[in-house]
Amino acid sequence: MMPPVRGTLTQGRSLADLTWLRVGGPADWLFQPADEADLVQFLGALDPAVPVFPMGVGSNLIVRDGGLRAVVIRLGRGFNAIRIEGDRVIAGAAALDAHVARHAADAGRDLTFLRTIPGSIGGAVRMNAGCYGSYVADHLIEVRAVTREGRPVTLPAAELGLAYRQSALPEGCVLTEATFRAEAGDPAALARRMDEQIARRDSSQPTKERSAGSTFRNPAGFSSTGRADDTHELKAWKLIDEAGLRGARRGGAQMSEMHSNFLINAGGATAADLEGLGEEVIKRVFQSSGIRLEWEIMRVGELPVNKE
């Protein structure tokens, strides 16, 4: 039995249309809370043995074809407010990164690094997302969250274990809001900078394709577009190129011809196609260079049951 909710609770909901790659099986349950109080009540009443998986907009995610044996929690409109208080930008976890960057810039506050990061604020914090030399950790003050037990908490950034493309958030903890410190800037200049970032991204990344952003972490731990990485040799895309894997395919999955560290659904791909191609790239890059790439895309869920 699931606890009563004011939001939406759906059994056996396919997750494929909720991910950017458009693949994956169903969740046992999908819960979309109306607001924080609804989330607190639900988690507090939910059997502690039931796994919980917080999901953003699915921009950095492969859900395997067998689906997810968990309650997937996806925040919606009740969690996407953005407000400015002095040098602080407070954003709901469901607010899109790009919207937060634009809203802050309009108010003369600089969070422009978020403009080209796909996804929502909750995912950006969880992954310590970064671009153009800035990371969430450089600006984050604190987050609000609800623990797996249904307890609202405020956690300072220093307690989140933020590192390259990762954090140490407790399992099942659902982020609901993040507070950033943002430097002052001229709104027009900030807007121009974001336009330049978008143009640079669109000229080098397959933004018109179904992808989940960068597939593998850069081995040295630098952002693929960060200033510190512009002179660094160990870039994932370069290692993939040197292994002859630009454009490599498996089923409907492909390593992009435009940017070889982007795994795309070129049409009709399954999660198995995408993950299988990624694992093949890891294997062949290691054979070629002796360097083992690490996934940046999160992969979750079960393999499909063989019905033969």
Swiss-Prot record:
Residues 22-185 form the FAD-binding PCMH-type domain. Residues 212-226 have a biased composition (Polar residues). Residues 197-228 are annotated as: Disordered. One of its GO terms (biological process) is peptidoglycan biosynthetic process. Pathway: Cell wall biogenesis; peptidoglycan biosynthesis. It catalyses: UDP-N-acetyl-alpha-D-muramate + NADP(+) = UDP-N-acetyl-3-O-(1-carboxyvinyl)-alpha-D-glucosamine + NADPH + H(+). It comes from the Bacteria. The active site is at residues 165, 214, 296. Residues 197-211 have a biased composition (Basic and acidic residues). Belongs to the MurB family. Cell wall formation. This is UDP-N-acetylenolpyruvoylglucosamine reductase. The lineage of its organism: Bacteria, Pseudomonadati, Pseudomonadota, Alphaproteobacteria, Rhodobacterales.
